[in-house]
Each structure stands twice: as structure tokens, then as C-alpha cells.
Amino acid sequence: MILITSGAEAEIYESENMIIKRRVKKNYRIDELDSMLNKTRTKREVNIIKKLNALNIPSPMFYTTNKYDIVMEKIKGIPVKNILNNESLTSNQFLNKICAKTHKDILIEIGNIVYAMHNNNIIHGDLTTLNFIYSDKIHIIDFGLSFYSNKDEDKAVDLYLFEKSLISVHNEEFVSYFYSGYIVNETLNKKLLEIRKRGRKRE
């Protein structure tokens, strides 16, 4: 296993076919509290991954877990961020498949995935194009901030943060492509407009 990422919340290890996500101990927290929080968050993340697998929403296949580790499938592909920015494509085995897809195709597919999640009351919590991987199809990854909610407020915040990510890292036009795959109903649209207005006031 090779350590590929070490963040504030977890360490990520990989082998050829597997990813292990290991939640890290926070020294500033009381041991009992730290253990309880890590177990709870690991359990919630596992539950969401298993739910996505059951719904056939493209995501890593869950393998096993213990108190602090999640073992899951390694999605072999390219971050969508790189594809949309035309980075690191020339030597990749997926180049021919990617070239057959337009940026609009990719964003529509992402819209379909996020819509399916929200339709099942799953909030991702960290929607960026780095958290979508293109292999044989687009997969969504990284559910450390994910949770369940049927509230339009939570879904609208998820969408708004992704809009901001698309505009800041890529192209404002990509937002409209995304919404070609994610159909916003009237009540959610009303809440999304409120969230955007609040966001503009803070900027």
C-alpha cells in the first residue's frame, strides 16, 4: 500500500485495485470523543457508499470496513477537472474515449449523477470536478462530508457550491451544461435562488 494523500481528516492509501481511507486521530480531542466521532463518521460514509452501490450510482464498490478504515474499489481513470482543463491526457489509455465526449456530455452526465443522489436524499457535501473520475464512465468519489437530507436547503447548498467550483476553476458556461443533466424543480429552484443571493451578499 502506498500513502497518496494525508489530510486533516484522513489518510488515503492505494494498491493496484484498492483504496483504503483511514481516519486520523486528532490529538487536541479527548480520546473517547475522538474515537466516537471517527467511528460515527466512518459508519456514515460506509452507509452512503453502500447505498450508492445499491442504487447503481457510479461510485467505488464497497469492500469492507473496521472502526476507522474503509476499503473500497480504486477507480482507475482521470479526474474530470483535468479533462475539462485539457490537462494530462496525451499518454492516457482513456484518451480515445474521452475525445469522443464533449465537455457538455461530461457535465450532463455529472448532472445525472448528482440528480440521482439528491433524488435519494444523499448530499455529497464537497462537489468539485476533482471528485468525479472518468474511466469507462464517470464515477463520483469522496464521501467524507456526505450526509442524508430531504431538505431543499441542503440540496441547494450542494448545487451552489458546485456552481462556484465550476465558475472559479473552469468556465461559467459549464453551469448550464450541468443543469442540462440535473432538472431543478420549482421549490428547489426557489431555494437555490435564495442561496445564490445570500452568497453574493457575502462576497
From Swiss-Prot:
GO molecular function, a single term: protein serine kinase activity
Residue stretches making up the Protein kinase domain: 1-203
Entry's EC annotation: 3.6.-.-, 2.7.11.1
Cellular component GO terms held in the UniProt record: chromosome, telomeric region; cytosol; nucleus
Domain of life: Eukaryota
Compartments where located: Cytoplasm; Nucleus; Chromosome, Telomere
Family annotation (InterPro entries): Bud32, Kinase-like_dom_sf, Prot_kinase_dom, RIO_dom, Tyr_kinase_AS
Active site: D126 (proton acceptor)
Family under the similarity heading: Belongs to the protein kinase superfamily. BUD32 family.
Keywords on record: Activator, ATP-binding, Chromosome, Cytoplasm, Hydrolase, Kinase, Nucleotide-binding, Nucleus, Phosphoprotein, Serine/threonine-protein kinase, Telomere, Transcription, Transcription regulation, Transferase, tRNA processing
GO BP: any one term: tRNA processing
Protein's UniProt name: EKC/KEOPS complex subunit BUD32
Subunit structure: Component of the EKC/KEOPS complex composed of at least BUD32, CGI121, GON7, KAE1 and PCC1; the whole complex dimerizes.
Organism: Enterocytozoon bieneusi (strain H348) (Microsporidian parasite)
Catalytic activity: L-seryl-[protein] + ATP = O-phospho-L-seryl-[protein] + ADP + H(+); L-threonyl-[protein] + ATP = O-phospho-L-threonyl-[protein] + ADP + H(+)
Comment block on domains: This protein is considered an atypical serine/threonine kinase, because it lacks the conventional structural elements necessary for the substrate recognition as well as a lysine residue that in all other serine/threonine kinases participates in the catalytic event. BUD32 has protein kinase activity in vitro, but in the context of the EKC/KEOPS complex, the catalytic subunit KAE1 switches the activity of BUD32 from kinase into ATPase.
Role summary: Component of the EKC/KEOPS complex that is required for the formation of a threonylcarbamoyl group on adenosine at position 37 (t(6)A37) in tRNAs that read codons beginning with adenine. The complex is probably involved in the transfer of the threonylcarbamoyl moiety of threonylcarbamoyl-AMP (TC-AMP) to the N6 group of A37. BUD32 has ATPase activity in the context of the EKC/KEOPS complex and likely plays a supporting role to the catalytic subunit KAE1. The EKC/KEOPS complex also promotes both telomere uncapping and telomere elongation.
Residues that hold ATP according to the record: I4, T5, S6, G7, A8, E9, A10, E11, I12, K26
